[in-house]
Amino acid sequence: MALIVHLKTVSELRGRADRIAKVTFRGQSFYSRVLENCEDVADFDETFRWPVASSIDRNEVLEIQIFNYSKVFSNKLIGTFRMVLQKVVEENRVEVSDTLIDDNNAIIKTSLSMEVRYQAADGTVGPWDDGDFLGDESLQEEEKDSQETDGLLPGSRPSTRTPGEKSFRSKGKEKTKGGRDGEHKAGRSVFSAMKLGKTRSHKEEPQRQDEPAVLEMEDLDHLAIRLGDGLDPDSVSLASVTALTSNVSNKRSKPDIKMEPSAGRPMDYQVSITVIEARQLVGLNMDPVVCVEVGDDKKYTSMKESTNCPYYNEYFVFDFHVSPDVMFDKIIKISVIHSKNLLRSGTLVGSFKMDVGTVYSQPEHQFHHKWAILSDPDDISAGLKGYVKCDVAVVGKGDNIKTPHKANETDEDDIEGNLLLPEGVPPERQWARFYVKIYRAEGLPRMNTSLMANVKKAFIGENKDLVDPYVQVFFAGQKGKTSVQKSSYEPLWNEQVVFTDLFPPLCKRMKVQIRDSDKVNDVAIGTHFIDLRKISNDGDKGFLPTLGPAWVNMYGSTRNYTLLDEHQDLNEGLGEGVSFRARLMLGLAVEILDTSNPELTSSTEVQVEQATPVSESCTGRMEEFFLFGAFLEASMIDRKNGDKPVTFEVTIGNYGNEVDGTSRPQRPRPRKEPGDEEEVDLIQNSSDDEGDEAGDLASVSSTPPMRPQITDRNYFHLPYLERKPCIYIKSWWPDQRRRLYNANIMDHIADKLEEGLNDVQEMIKTEKSYPERRLRGVLEELSCGCHRFLSLSDKDQGHSSRTRLDRERLKSCMRELESMGQQAKSLRAQVKRHTVRDKLRLCQNFLQKLRFLADEPQHSIPDVFIWMMSNNKRIAYARVPSKDLLFSIVEEELGKDCAKVKTLFLKLPGKRGFGSAGWTVQAKLELYLWLGLSKQRKDFLCGLPCGFEEVKAAQGLGLHSFPPISLVYTKKQTFQLRAHMYQARSLFAADSTGLSDPFARVFFINQSQCTEVLNETLCPTWDQMLVFDNLELYGEAHELRDDPPIIVIEIYDQDSMGKADFMGRTFAKPLVKMADEAYCPPRFPPQLEYYQIYRGNATAGDLLAAFELLQIGPSGKADLPPINGPVDMDRGPIMPVPVGIRPVLSKYRVEVLFWGLRDLKRVNLAQVDRPRVDIECAGKGVQSSLIHNYKKNPNFNTLVKWFEVDLPENELLHPPLNIRVVDCRAFGRYTLVGSHAVSSLRRFIYRPPDRSAANWNTTGEVVVSMEPEVPVKKLETLVKLDATSDAVVKVDVAEDEKERKKKKKKGPSEEAEEEEPDESMLDWWSKYFASIDTMKEQLRQHETSGIDLEEKEEMDSTEGLKGPVKNKEKSRAAKEEKKKKNQNPGPGQGSEAPEKKKAKIDELKVYPKELESEFDNFEDWLHTFNLLRGKTGDDEDGSTEEERIVGRFKGSLCVYKVPLPEDVSREAGYDPTYGMFQGIPSNDPINVLVRIYVVRATDLHPADINGKADPYIAIKLGKTDIRDKENYISKQLNPVFGKSFDIEASFPMESMLTVAVYDWDLVGTDDLIGETKIDLENRFYSKHRATCGIAQTYSIHGYNIWRDPMKPSQILTRLCKEGKVDGPHFGPHGRVKVANRVFTGPSEIEDENGQRKPTDEHVALSALRHWEDIPRVGCRLVPEHVETRPLLNPDKPGIEQGRLELWVDMFPMDMPAPGTPLDISPRKPKKYELRVIVWNTDEVVLEDDDFFTGEKSSDIFVRGWLKGQQEDKQDTDVHYHSLTGEGNFNWRYLFPFDYLAAEEKIVMSKKESMFSWDETEYKIPARLTLQIWDADHFSADDFLGAIELDLNRFPRGAKTAKQCTMEMATGEVDVPLVSIFKQKRVKGWWPLLARNENDEFELTGKVEAELHLLTAEEAEKNPVGLARNEPDPLEKPNRPDTAFVWFLNPLKSIKYLICTRYKWLIIKIVLALLGLLMLALFLYSLPGYMVKKLLGA
């Protein structure tokens, strides 16, 4: 069978261009070759061939599209020709010449000529002549090429029901064939056949699934590839690139319908903010406080005095219990306030704000160590006000966030590279104005009682609208509101609310609310949220936020006014609105401000101004829309509503609302204007005889009242039978359909993509073959969909009512989809079997992006509401988006529910729908809806099931176009439904026993049936077939086959008293068999499938079932397939699931390891004493032995038992295994203690080992060089062994180890250079901090490699796409630049210029999580099953599974097919009594020494009012309870405990260790902050050997001493013995052989005296560290470690209360005793004394003006401190009246301090306030502050300048004052950095800086100082005096004696003034005068001398 198209020519083309044709049939497309430079005629002369597996339907369509081809841009569509293949099917050969149509369905001149041929399989169609085509050489070439195809693509198969063979443009003109004359009794109008988008009949689908697919070529220059008839896709040479586009898994049978509203339900949230420090605060000599606000809650840090860079490190926690929407809109505000105290509120320096949602959307829901930029909201021209470094995290219930490790944190001084901004936000944000323009509103509801209004009307005759509206806008923590419009349902404002904020803003949403002004309390009428991300685009070609002018629809509570509205929350925007409230016309614009403009208002206060009014037509031309609905079924009506008549009302906006839509605006129907383009486009859709005059067509919006009939004890139904009521509503809305059409196209693409991705996931989950092919098909469909969007979306470009957002958004969507299509195409080629999961993740990103783009921010037509009403009260509703119902003649634009029968489940409004009330179905409707323009009305019945007659409201001439008020079905089909209910698993526990008595109730149409009740199980196997006979369904048979009604299955718990409890619900669609179909594979019989059961929004188990709907033909039930039940069972009237559907069974053996029971709680107040465990699976089971005295020994005597059972061969269908624990009481009674259901046996199935695998091989050699000290960048060394490798592992001591040993012996100079630590100085903390450094380095490397990999993938997927990658490249370049800066930081960045070489220190492993998560819960052979009792709690109860746990069963399972492979039972030492559990240890009681090391806690939840806690450790194990109350740590949220505790315990009685952190309180009981529980028994018995961690190196002394009482060689010997492994065999030269693996390593060890001795321990340790490579028994051994465990509080389940770092060692008491515990007590800070001598100052700015002379001078003194101004501030004396800025002091400060070198922090203890009970320890950075001041006698001293020196890294001082420049402090020049802790003594000149009026640094002086650091001991030996005192006094400075007052010593002053100030001037004048005098004397004497000379005298 094949369809062949010969495309000849296309003529009358316009212009000269390259042409290409695309021919599509059944979604499979071929492209022609490109014809270059065609002018008028394109002569294609090409043949295309489709092999078809199923016969062609006469209604199928062939589509030809002609494009102008472009290599660069997307191809431009010239025109389309669509042909219905009716004539081709009848005559086999058709010649066609016809014109094309354009996008708007208008005829164009261009025409094509072609020939179409078809041969059916049975040869029924005409004579066939092969020669015409098959002789064609080109085709044979193509046939040949197709053998080498690298891809196959079946596309989607759109189809139509259009009779007639002409192209679609002739729609309105042509009558259908076959005797239909267009009368309505046939159930279809003439035009009904024109509906596109109705899915093609699936009758042939199974045959077609394997049909060869055709690839749509990426390179259009090539010929399209064709595949020959009957060729199996997998036989193609490159089958790996095959694509599959039809669904493999039967997902369509599982409609996903969630009943309960999820939005609006409150949840627990915790916002934690750590304020670390602030930098570069603007202002002089500040006392800053940081205020942290979240919503309305405020908290403050302590005040730091006289500093511009305060250090706080304070932690704040805010707890909330609100709905997610409210939470994410809360604003986090961080402000810095200067001089705040009890009396003063302080002045704001700057603030920073962002919403909680922005933080939550970050990776791990947090910002870590980021700098917030402060700006002044009162002065937007002021610029930057400083930075605050903080951590911000938002945690919801159940969120697990990974917090980076707190210890040993270095200052990240790269501020610019670590700003508190989301990815993509530029660091320099600009100020912008946000103009929210409010124009007018319509359709407001009544908001006052009419009582007073009626009184007024009676007295005054005044009739007012009962609402006084105004609009309030909330944005970024500010709000503004318009004026109030008194008494108006249609208020007109024309005002704009103006916000000023930084752009882009860090607040995502703007809230616009219409409120009613009231004297007592204003209430919200409706709320709309504007998401700024949806109305802007931040890309290169993006646009600023813009909106409208456009109408937005507001929804909320019902419109009837009551004084106390229970649904008022809905009007506030919380939860889904249940009714239309109003619509508001608004606009939004953003203007970026030029802050340098002097006319700019600098405040950010909200302003309200007048806005320019806009015309009414700006939102689009008003059009009349027509909504039609037909109610085909109303069932499952809740019994509460069953006693009164029920009616259904449909509304759109206020139209159709007859009960409370009183304030509906009466809009006149707009006149048609002759020039309208739309009119021309759609002229074919309207007809002349349409009854369109206003008033001709009244709306009918509700069904006639009808009394429900009973279905069963829970539900009723309405007996519609063959008469189906209809509704229709006329309404007027602006015509903005284009927006909805574009959204629909994207929704269609997204739905198709989601369906495909779900299918791929299902294939992976169920392990179906070739998921990669299906993913390729999904990507191919996505690519085609994106290209289709580009061709369809760009219509109506010149539409006058298009807003700027419409235009920009369309461009943006087109760019995104074009890029997505190309990425999908290139991704398709990369999909391989091993990359499926990675590519699936990338596709999920596509889906998210599509969903985001499809959400249209500018509304047009309001949503449709369907209300069920009883007794004139609204009971329940459903809401359908209008875009889903919108009609279009283009298939892709059609709403997904338009002209389709949709199943709707009505729900209760608002909060009534939460919880158990929301679980009940209020009503189930089968409803047909259609929405379109009135002029398209002829189509409204086109999708209804056929076979009806219309009943009109009125009869008369010309009324045939009126819609019907009901439909009477004359055609009906009779069916039988078979529901094969096999089993369910993981159901909710509905009884107090923790079990249920479940039965299932199946609903179909108006019938329901129940399965039998199975008692006391959560995993019932009903194995029952329910048969529903004589089901009457209305409509055509084939329509029912394609889209059968939904089956509802509800699971209930049978109660002896009262009604059954609801446990969950699921939905299914049956597989339909028509009477003329054979009941045979592949479709029948149906396969059992799992259906997810939901209770509300929570999953409540799975149902394994199958459903089939069988048509009963003319000969009755005789034609139905027989019911073949299993012959071996007789269950009376209950019919089991038939053979063929029920699973195929095999014999399995289930071995059970019974180890013991733990922590059993009392049952009915009585203790459990003699428990027993019952195991049951598929009706078979086994009982454990009885524990005779649970208190004495809770373990079982008999360890292993087994039973045999028949289980399905398909592992996915395995039934659950039930574990029950009963307590055996006297007189044969027993009570259920608790139960556990193992829902999946998969992990317990035994699979024989693969003998060919690598670790079974015993030959080969691998060399591994092991370094005892792991360098920073080296990750864990693993030995990989392949099947042919020799098994020798060489562990060499690395060369640098030997070098290190050598260097130790060298002199001190080399040692200093190498920075080699002195081993005697090292302790456990050195090891800990070194390990954390390594961990951080590894994480950093991991992140960078992760980023690189991600970017590589991005680059791969965007191959050849230059545009989309640009941003990425830019940001990457910036990151690289930053990285370089960080690696070579300047001096200002506070890091040493030469990179510090890491000292070599032995390390341990720091796990940032629990040890259990790293080692699979230590369940390698012993599993823990939680036993549950009691009812499953509901979400709103806040109850968790934890509360239902009544104990734990320890044991294991092993499931395998019998008989067992012989080689297993023949293995050495096989003990049949233990079965598969060979080599397990004895479970007799054992005494153990448990040693707990608690290192530290981080981020504890504050427990006191002051926001701090006083934590201490409490440990409980069995009866031992240790409370370390005396050693509580005062006011600390990050305490370092450094404690170890030894407890002797006895397993199994004492095996659960609880480590808790309590808050110490002086009065009252101590509060629990949080606790963590550790199961020690699983650790103790685990093969991972978690008793004592294996260290990295073996040492017998020093800080890294070996802790385990067993040496490595002893451990190795024991492991070999237990695992029955050959070895260990120690050989010479450090060799050891273990099971054909040889390890080599160092063979000597150095003792405390430096003596070297031979040892085997090093090599034994290397074998232990590679134990996972030992064949058969190898596994990873737990290394020496510290684990980080979350602390949880039972009162706040699911939210971490902090983290605790600890580790646990266990030592059996029958082994050698361990050594003394390690000393991990917190390091004591070392005492130092810093001596600072201030010698001189120079160039100090002169501040004072002299009273008499106006001379500038300063009275200088220098102030310095180390810990804080209040703690140790010291001042020099005053150098008075310095006229030059020079000051001489010779003054010494002494600063004693305690210092922690590892953390680089000064430790100080002080009382927090005068009321504090004890001192609090603070850790602050070691920074010396020097300030220069001008002393004043009467007023306050003036601050002149300061410098802050970080004692660990500060610029070296200049040698002279001249060389000292400002750049030394600002880091602009490269100055060497020094550390006082290394240099000990430093002297030099340093600059002092202050900020000027322009907020820039300026030099205000220089200080010469000398810093000398001594330890406390050295300081004691060499004491010195403070200031200039003894001992070792400093000389008095030689100051100029100008400290005077004029009138005391005038001569001295004159002398100073003249001598000092005018010295050089006076000298010059004197010299000049002397010169003049000499000249005068010379001139005076000259004549006399000359005369004398002349006369010779």
Swiss-Prot record:
Q: Which GO terms describe its cellular component?
A: apical part of cell; basal part of cell; basolateral plasma membrane; cell projection; cochlear hair cell ribbon synapse; endoplasmic reticulum; endoplasmic reticulum membrane; Golgi membrane
Described by its record, this protein's role is as follows: Key calcium ion sensor involved in the Ca(2+)-triggered synaptic vesicle-plasma membrane fusion and in the control of neurotransmitter release at these output synapses. Interacts in a calcium-dependent manner to the presynaptic SNARE proteins at ribbon synapses of cochlear inner hair cells (IHCs) to trigger exocytosis of neurotransmitter. Also essential to synaptic exocytosis in immature outer hair cells (OHCs). May also play a role within the recycling of endosomes.
Cytoplasmic topological domain: 1-1959
- Where it mainly occurs, coarsely classed, is membrane
**Segments of this protein annotated with the region Disordered:** 127-212, 654-708, 1294-1318, 1339-1398
> Which residue intervals are annotated with compositional bias (Acidic residues) in the record?
129-145, 675-695, 1348-1357
Q: Which sequence ranges are listed under topological domain Extracellular? A: 1981-1993
One GO BP: synaptic vesicle exocytosis
Q: Which organism is it from?
A: Rattus norvegicus
Q: How is the cofactor bound?
A: Binds Ca(2+). The ions are bound to the C2 1 domain.
CDD domains cross-referenced by the UniProt entry: C2A_Ferlin (cd08373), C2B_Ferlin (cd04011), C2C_Ferlin (cd04018), C2D_Ferlin (cd04017), C2E_Ferlin (cd04037), C2F_Ferlin (cd08374)
Membrane topology category: Single-pass type II membrane protein
Where does the chain bind Ca(2+) 5? D1832, S1835, D1838
Could you give a GO molecular-function term held by this entry?
Answer: calcium ion binding
| Chain positions recorded as Ca(2+) 3 binding sites | D1504, D1510, D1559, D1561
Binding-site list for Ca(2+) 2: D991, D1053, D1055, D1061
Q: How does the annotation summarize its subunit structure?
A: Interacts with SNAP25; the interaction is direct. Interacts with STX1; the interaction is direct. Interacts with RAB8B.
Task: Report residues binding Ca(2+) 4.
Answer: D1504, D1559, D1561, D1567
Looking up InterPro entries in the UniProt record yields: C2_dom (IPR000008), C2_domain_sf (IPR035892), C2A_Ferlin (IPR037726), C2B_Ferlin (IPR037720), C2C_Ferlin (IPR037722), C2D_Ferlin (IPR037723), C2E_Ferlin (IPR037724), C2F_Ferlin (IPR037725)
Q: What is this protein's name?
A: Otoferlin
Question: Where does the sequence pass through the membrane?
Answer: 1960-1980
Q: What PROSITE patterns would the database entry show?
A: C2 (PS50004)
